[in-house]
């Protein structure tokens, strides 16, 4: 079982994928807020990539403002490349994506940019839904869990992590920016779910 200390080691360019409504934008905003407190607001930026959903850009701007960081919009890969070049002085750039294009996102490459790619899934996601993100042997730098609670049964997530080499990193319990992100280890996740199973038997 693998886990990764994403928050402690986070720098450079990080791109996030996941289904629509999974909570990508709020997770990214929390990451931005957390890291801005450590390295300074001027050193962090959020980029929205190819997300043309109604209200999506407004939400990015709102949450970026609450996190105290700048936000940018890239309509395609070429504009993303230009924006990332302009942001080369930033210590951390977080890239939000359209939930409808997660598999495209995994194969995305930007010349001269080392893009770390992360998958965000909901705690109640089914194993079949998770498998879709690995069906073409996609690899992700880490997996993040949204809508997490200690009472949630996350066996599908655990099974998916056991079958793939994707390390677990952090979890988000709710959309409130002031609720801190949680570092998660696979072993702790398994133990917690085993305890929940035992409690449910009584």
Regions found by a protein language model. Name each.
Residues 1-44, 48-52, 61-77, 81-85:
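Primarily NTPase-proximal linker/entry elements flanking Walker-type ATP/GTP-binding cores
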Residues 52, 66, 76-85, 92, ...:
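Conserved catalytic-core segment of NTP-binding enzymes
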Residues 57-58:
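Short, surface-exposed alpha-helical segments at coil->helix boundaries
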Residues 202:
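Expand to "…catalyze enediolate/carbanion chemistry for C-C bond making/breaking, isomerization
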């Amino acid at each position: 079982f693998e886990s990764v200390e994403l928050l402690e080691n986070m720098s450079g360019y990080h791109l996030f994928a996941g289904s629509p409504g999974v909570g990508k934008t709020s997770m990214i905003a929390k990451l931005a807020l957390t890291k801005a407190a450590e390295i300074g607001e001027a050193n962090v930026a959020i980029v929205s990539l190819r997300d043309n959903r109604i209200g999506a850009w407004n939400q990015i701007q709102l949450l970026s403002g609450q996190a105290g960081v700048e936000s940018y919009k890239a309509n395609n890969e070429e504009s993303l490349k230009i924006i990332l070049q302009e942001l080369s002085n930033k210590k951390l750039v977080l890239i939000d994506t359209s939930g409808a294009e997660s598999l495209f996102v995994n194969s995305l490459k930007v010349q001269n940019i080392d893009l770390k790619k992360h998958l965000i899934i909901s705690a109640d996601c089914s194993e079949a839904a998770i498998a879709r993100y690995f069906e073409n042997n996609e690899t992700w730098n880490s997996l993040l869990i949204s809508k997490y609670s200690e009472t949630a049964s996350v066996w599908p997530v655990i099974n998916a992590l056991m079958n793939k080499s994707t390390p677990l990193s952090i979890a988000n319990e709710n959309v409130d920016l002031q609720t801190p992100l949680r570092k998660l280890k696979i072993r702790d996740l398994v133990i917690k779910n085993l305890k929940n199973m035992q409690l449910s038997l009584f």
